[in-house]
C-alpha cells in the first residue's frame, strides 16, 4: 500500500506524515511531495523513526515521482488562513494549486483514492472532480473531501461538556466543511441528551472552531496539528478498507445522489474500491432539519464556484 502526501512540508503535511510514518501498516510506502526544497529532508528526518514504513521525499514543480504507484493521495498543499480570513478567502490561491496537483494525479495514478484537505474543501473537491472528469478518469467513489476535523472536534467538545471519555463519543457531521455548512448531528449521539441551548452553542462552536484556532495562534497559523491527526485518521481508515477490513465507516464530503447538493458530507462505508455505500443521514431533529435547509444555498454556491473555475 502506497500513500502519497502532497503539501508534505507544510504544517498539516508534516504532522500528517509523522502520524502515517508511525501508524501505517508494516510494509507500507509513504511518499512526501512539496514544492519546498526542504521536503526530501523531512523524509530523511522521518526515516529515522523505527517503523516498517518506507519513506521518500520529493520537491520541485513535478509531483510525478511521488505519485507513481500510489493507492491513496492526500492533498494538503496550499496557503493557510490568517486572522480575518475565512476559508473562502483562500480560494484564489488554493484553487490553482489543487487543479495543478489533481491534473498530475490523473496522469500518474488515475486509480488512486484522493483525499482533499486543502481549503475551501466545499469548492476544492468540485475542482478536483471536474479536472478528473476532463481527463476521463473520474470515479466518484474515489474522491473525498476530508471533513474528519469536524468530527474529532465534535467528539472532543461533546465529551468535555458531558464528562465522557472522548474516545467513547462519535458524532456524525454532515453537509460541508465551512461555517454554516458544518452540521453535527447531536441528536444521533447515543446515550447523551442536550438542551436546546446546548445544541445551539455546541453547533456554533463546532462551526467556528477553526477560527478559534486561527485567533489563538495570533497570526502564526491555523489548525495544523489537529488537522494532521484528522487527516491521518481518515487516511488510515481508507487504507484499512482498501486492504479488505470490513465495517470501516467515516464521514467525508463526496459526490452522492444529489439529494441535497452535488457534493455532501455523510457517513460512508469504505471498501476495496473507496466508497462502498453512502449511508443514510438518518432522522434529523427539527433544529438539524432547519440548519440543513438553511445551508444548501451556501453549499451549492461553493460547489458551483469550483465547477466554474475548471470549466470557464
UniProtKB/Swiss-Prot annotation:
GO process annotations (BP): malate metabolic process; tricarboxylic acid cycle
Gene: mdh
List of catalytic residues: 177
The protein's name in its UniProt record: Malate dehydrogenase
Organism: Escherichia coli (strain SE11)
Keyword annotations of the record: NAD, Oxidoreductase, Tricarboxylic acid cycle
Assembly and oligomerization: Homodimer.
Annotated PROSITE patterns: MDH
Binding site for substrate: 81, 87, 119, 153
Amino acid at each position: 500500500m502506497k500513500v502519497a502526501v502532497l503539501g508534505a512540508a507544510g504544517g498539516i503535511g508534516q504532522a500528517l506524515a509523522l502520524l502515517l510514518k508511525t501508524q501505517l501498516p508494516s510494509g507500507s510506502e509513504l511518499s512526501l511531495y512539496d514544492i519546498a526544497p526542504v521536503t526530501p529532508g523531512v523524509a530523511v528526518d522521518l526515516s529515522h523513526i523505527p517503523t516498517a514504513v518506507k519513506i521518500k521525499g520529493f520537491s520541485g514543480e513535478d509531483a510525478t515521482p511521488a505519485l507513481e504507484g500510489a493507492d491513496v493521495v492526500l492533498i494538503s498543499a496550499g496557503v493557510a488562513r490568517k486572522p480575518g480570513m475565512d476559508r473562502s478567502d483562500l480560494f484564489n490561491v488554493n484553487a490553482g494549486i489543487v487543479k495543478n496537483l489533481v491534473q498530475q494525479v490523473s496522469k500518474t495514478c488515475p486509480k488512486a483514492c484522493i483525499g482533499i484537505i486543502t481549503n475551501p474543501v466545499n469548492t476544492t473537491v468540485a475542482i478536483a472532480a471536474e479536472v478528473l472528469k476532463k481527463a476521463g478518469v473520474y470515479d466518484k467513489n474515489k474522491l473525498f473531501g476530508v471533513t474528519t476535523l469536524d468530527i474529532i472536534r465534535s467528539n472532543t467538545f461533546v465529551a468535555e461538556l458531558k464528562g465522557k471519555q472522548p474516545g467513547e463519543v462519535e458524532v456524525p457531521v454532515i453537509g460541508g466543511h465551512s461555517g454554516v455548512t458544518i452540521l453535527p448531528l447531536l441528536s444521533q449521539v447515543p446515550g447523551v441528551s442536550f438542551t436546546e441551548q446546548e445544541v445551539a452553542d455546541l453547533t456554533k462552536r463546532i462551526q467556528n472552531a477553526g477560527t478559534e484556532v486561527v485567533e489563538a495562534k495570533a497570526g502564526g497559523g491555523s489548525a495544523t496539528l489537529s488537522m494532521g491527526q484528522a487527516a491521518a485518521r481518515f487516511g488510515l481508515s481508507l487504507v484499512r478498507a482498501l486492504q479488505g477490513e470490513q465495517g470501516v465507516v467515516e464521514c467525508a464530503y463526496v459526490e452522492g445522489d444529489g439529494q441535497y447538493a452535488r457534493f455532501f458530507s455523510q457517513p460512508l462505508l469504505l471498501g476495496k474500491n473507496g466508497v462502498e455505500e453512502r449511508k443514510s443521514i438518518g432522522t434529523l431533529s427539527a433544529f438539524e432539519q432547519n440548519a440543513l435547509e438553511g445551508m444548501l444555498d451556501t453549499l451549492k454556491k461553493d460547489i458551483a464556484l469550483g465547477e466554474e473555475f475548471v470549466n470557464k
